[in-house]
Amino acid sequence: MSPTLDDQSPMEIRCTEEGAGPGIFRMELGDQRQSISQSQRWCCLQRGCVILGVLGLLAGAGIASWLLVLYLWPAASPSISGTLQEEEMTLNCPGVSREEELLPSLPKTVSFRINGEDLLLQVQVRARPDWLLVCHEGWSPALGMHICKSLGHIRLTQHKAVNLSDIKLNRSQEFAQLSARPGGLVEESWKPSANCPSGRIVSLKCSECGARPLASRIVGGQAVASGRWPWQASVMLGSRHTCGASVLAPHWVVTAAHCMYSFRLSRLSSWRVHAGLVSHGAVRQHQGTMVEKIIPHPLYSAQNHDYDVALLQLRTPINFSDTVGAVCLPAKEQHFPWGSQCWVSGWGHTDPSHTHSSDTLQDTMVPLLSTYLCNSSCMYSGALTHRMLCAGYLDGRADACQGDSGGPLVCPSGDTWHLVGVVSWGRGCAEPNRPGVYAKVAEFLDWIHDTVQVR
């Protein structure tokens, strides 16, 4: 029979220190003290050691955890840089592969530029610091087209020979001659020379792109003025905005393949492309341009949005002006480093909770992030392919959203803007560790040029 509370005094358990040795405890039951035998002392000693050991381990683990948190916790900073974000994610996501950082970057053997009012073609050979004027000997329109495409332009518009006697040159000016090797690579065909035998050099003009004549946020974005992004277009099905697009040439725009795939059963005559719009309220005064042909990338995957680009050929050309123009493609081998400040624009949702697109064009600045970072276990766990890139903030302050798909992600190189990405997909909008994912335009240059040239 168990004693009742009335039968005995309340039990009190407490530990007291016994003897000179610290940490050795004995148990007392209320005031009923008893003498402790030698075996009982030895038992208490063993138990005390066990308790001390456990407490010591717990204390050590606590201190170690505290130091680890102090060491690994990312410091808050208002500025965003690609390096800082990558460091944070590398520390917090063990096992992240840095494979792409280990890939050697090959030095460019030749660079081109078009300089001055005379549009003189210049070449920089084998990393020499000086720019060489190109001699006209051996020149061909095909070579001009190749150079224009390597600079991010869609096509060659004009080329001619210029007499050296008609321009002022520095005495130290040197030239580049084409080698006579048939079938050689363009990048290996240039030879520095002190003069041009014919006394003529090359003037080259490519299709205009990447300029913002009137240039003076999307979630977290701001409304933009007319002409700020002259290549921005709206792809409409009837009177409904479905996706953004970017103007490449008067007859061509590029958008996301998933935009067209979602409405693949729609009649071609129902599609219109509107360029130069800032507000969709002006659509009634803007007839738009009918779509002649929809050309999604042949390898597009609806499962993971790989190869998520499509070209739209227009029935009539877009009229270029101060508020409407083409964006440049990435120049050949052009690299925008992680952390580069780029811009995304569109008419998508301005708040993740909204169900309707914005009536006015929005834009926001986002930094480029490395693919290894976005493929980490903290973000997209390997979902990005080599045809994708991502941009945004780890804290989710600004991002593209529904309705922005197909629109441009552009990055500046001097005063020229290049189409680096096409808005493709993401998980949520402006959520932490969920930046926007874009089709990487540099991976589609050959397909774009081949498609545009043969039609």
Swiss-Prot record:
Keywords: Cell membrane, Disulfide bond, Glycoprotein, Hydrolase, Membrane, Protease, Serine protease, Signal-anchor, Transmembrane, Transmembrane helix
Main location: membrane
Residues passing through the membrane, by range: 50-70
Domain Peptidase S1: from-to ranges: 218-453
Catalytic residue list: H258, D308, S405
GO molecular function: serine-type endopeptidase activity
The UniProt record lists the keyword Transmembrane helix: yes
Site positions (Cleavage): R217, I218
Disulfide bonds: C135-C196, C148-C206, C209-C328, C243-C259, C342-C411, C374-C390, C401-C429
Record-stated family: Belongs to the peptidase S1 family.
Superkingdom: Eukaryota
UniProt-listed Pfam families: SRCR_2 (PF15494), Trypsin (PF00089)
Keyword Protein transport in annotation: no
Protein name as annotated: Transmembrane protease serine 5
